[in-house]
Amino acid sequence: MGQKWKLYIVKDGKVIRKNKFCPRCGPGVFMADHGDRWACGRCGYTEWKKK
């Protein structure tokens, strides 16, 4: 916890998110990238990536 700064990058003077937000929990709750899926650690929502 407390390391949300690692989930942002600055490119061409703009701040860009590396991971996406959870559609259930809303802005501020990031989903974890597990390679084959995106998962929310708060509510458990999972999106599978397409091959």
Swiss-Prot record:
Record GO terms (molecular function): structural constituent of ribosome; zinc ion binding
GO cellular-component term (any): ribosome
Sites where the protein binds Zn(2+): C22, C25, C40, C43
Cofactor info, note text: Binds 1 zinc ion per subunit.
An example Gene Ontology biological process: translation
Keywords: Metal-binding, Ribonucleoprotein, Ribosomal protein, Zinc, Zinc-finger
ZnF (C4-type) intervals: 22-43
Family: Belongs to the eukaryotic ribosomal protein eS31 family.
Matching NCBIfam families: PRK00432.1 (NF001669)
Record protein name field: Small ribosomal subunit protein eS31
Record organism: Pyrococcus abyssi (strain GE5 / Orsay)
